[in-house]
Amino acid sequence: AGNSGTLGRLVLGLLVHSKKKIKLKGDKSLSRRDFLRVIKPLEKFGAKFNSNYGKLPIKIQGTNYSKPIRYFENKGSAQCKSSVMFAALNTSGETIIKAKKSRDHSELLFKYLKLPIKIMKKNKYDIIKVKGKHDVPALNYKIPSDISSAAFFIVLTALTKNSILKIRNVNINPSRIGVFYILKLMGIRISKLNIKNYKGEKVADLIIKSTNKIKSINCPIKFNSSAIDEFLLIFLVAAKAKGVSYFKNLSELNQKESPRLKWSSKILNKIGIKNIVTENSIKIYGNPKLKINKKIVIKHFLKDHRVFMTSVIAALSFGGEWQIFDKDSINTSFPSFLKKIDYLGAKID
């Protein structure tokens, strides 16, 4: 699975009915991450899992006699929810999932493929019912541009004076674009053009324009889930804002490839930005005149691909000479990232 937590967790749901014993492995970064919260509900289907204390590598023995389950997902993990949905698709009977609001790509795909799914939307939770067994039709699918990848260049544009960026054909699923709303509240100008539906998902072209005055923010927690992968970048924008920005209820960031709140604080400290970090919040004292004229070294970050790429964006935005280790950390999620950075004129050794 490389260092892809999404691939690792989703494939476990698909392997619940495997007739062969399967061993799932990942790189060092992924092997440090917790898989127990997806293993536990999948065991209820009847499959057997032998793991390294809830971590990779994991041995899976599928079941021929799976039974539908009831599952309460209260962390807002789309990966866990989707893994259970995939397992339910090949299980006779109706599986019922009560899930905290999270990304809904799997639900939209199920609907587009006309698979047997019912969704009742509540205030904070969705009730999802999946009926199995059901064959999945084949389809050709061209994946739209990923907002999490686009966000690096959106933030670089936001932090670069007199800049305009256009990105074509970006997935603007409402459960993914919290970063738009947060950046707009901070004064960044983002507009959507040519909005259309593509196989259940909304896509659009994006226009991003920088601003001379970035505003501080008391970030509404309603955007946390839909911006969870972009917060490291958002914190860079807060570093350049006028005033104090506050972000809370972000303990989920510490369940990623590295404890990202801690690493955000470290990066901010290195660039001279005062901040106060707790287990689930961070307060950032912005400096609109921020400019770096020293050497900065970023290493020992558990090969978290987003820490690497965020550090590159910080270097381009704030100046200075940066030495950033472990560039191989981006090989799974964004292998062409440095080529795109090089195209923009950055000097990379």
Which residue stretches match the model-derived regions?
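Structural preference for solvent-exposed beta-strand-turn elements
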Residues: 1-349
